[in-house]
């Protein structure tokens, strides 16, 4: 309602915005309703159409650029690593088997006394400890699965050590006979090389060949297993027969010639009865060790030995 018209009394403004009543003048104020056209100013809300600007997010389609990852097919170029098969040339290390000869050279200078019994028992303990540590390394192709025979051999070695110590104690109390025939010692001293030399040589071969770690070539190809076709190269592990060169350790037979030198020194020895007993115990222990070594399945690659389960 505008102008000089004053709404008083029973004057009622209806929806059609027509002033009626005592004013006398009926005036359509509908022209003012058009002022409400400002409400459509809310059309600015569709300005939110800028939100579709998020279409830039599909720019992440660059992620498929990771197709370059199959470029890792160059990793099979590591097949040159099998050139490390030349490492078994280190089988010349068994030449160090001559070092145990120094042990016998010192024994040759000894005379049959009570000191021989103690020294031989200490040597037997040291050789057992060395062979025990080397046996732990001998299962380098079993992928972490321990050999059950090791536990049995440990239990068998304990009473043998105690028996050697008891014999040493008993022999201290008994008088020693320095006139024992040299021929009797020849048969005994022939067993000494088996006790001191042969077990270390066979185990040194297995220990020295551990650095070949042919497993590294396998583990490096495992990341390439994302390319299933590349896994077809895993049969390249046919290089395992190449390890058949390990039997080239027939040089151990050369080590058997060493007892010939020990016999020459043995003819010069004059030992006590204690030597015969302690040496026989050492020979028994070496036989047990060589028996457990035969069971070492170095090409089974983690597959347990069925005889172990039995």
UniProtKB/Swiss-Prot annotation:
<feature type="compositionally biased region" description="Basic and acidic residues">
    <location>
        <begin position="103"/>
        <end position="114"/>
    </location>
</feature>
<feature type="compositionally biased region" description="Basic and acidic residues">
    <location>
        <begin position="147"/>
        <end position="160"/>
    </location>
</feature>
<feature type="region of interest" description="Disordered">
    <location>
        <begin position="53"/>
        <end position="310"/>
    </location>
</feature>
<feature type="repeat" description="45 AA repeat 1">
    <location>
        <begin position="107"/>
        <end position="152"/>
    </location>
</feature>
<feature type="region of interest" description="4 X 6 AA tandem repeats of V-V-T-G-S-C">
    <location>
        <begin position="1"/>
        <end position="23"/>
    </location>
</feature>
<dbReference type="Pfam" id="PF10511">
    <property type="entry name" value="Cementoin"/>
</dbReference>
<protein>
    <recommendedName>
        <fullName>300 kDa antigen AG231</fullName>
    </recommendedName>
</protein>
<feature type="compositionally biased region" description="Low complexity">
    <location>
        <begin position="53"/>
        <end position="101"/>
    </location>
</feature>
<feature type="compositionally biased region" description="Low complexity">
    <location>
        <begin position="191"/>
        <end position="235"/>
    </location>
</feature>
<feature type="compositionally biased region" description="Polar residues">
    <location>
        <begin position="236"/>
        <end position="263"/>
    </location>
</feature>
<feature type="repeat" description="45 AA repeat 2">
    <location>
        <begin position="266"/>
        <end position="310"/>
    </location>
</feature>
<dbReference type="InterPro" id="IPR019541">
    <property type="entry name" value="Trappin_transglut-bd_rpt"/>
</dbReference>
<keyword id="KW-0677">Repeat</keyword>
<feature type="compositionally biased region" description="Polar residues">
    <location>
        <begin position="176"/>
        <end position="190"/>
    </location>
</feature>
<keyword id="KW-0461">Malaria</keyword>
<keyword id="KW-0477">Merozoite</keyword>
<dbReference type="InterPro" id="IPR009745">
    <property type="entry name" value="CRAM_rpt"/>
</dbReference>
<feature type="compositionally biased region" description="Basic and acidic residues">
    <location>
        <begin position="264"/>
        <end position="273"/>
    </location>
</feature>
<feature type="region of interest" description="13 X 6 AA approximate tandem repeats">
    <location>
        <begin position="188"/>
        <end position="265"/>
    </location>
</feature>
<dbReference type="Pfam" id="PF07016">
    <property type="entry name" value="CRAM_rpt"/>
</dbReference>
<feature type="region of interest" description="13 X 6 AA tandem repeats of V-V-[TI]-[QE]-E-[PH]">
    <location>
        <begin position="29"/>
        <end position="106"/>
    </location>
</feature>
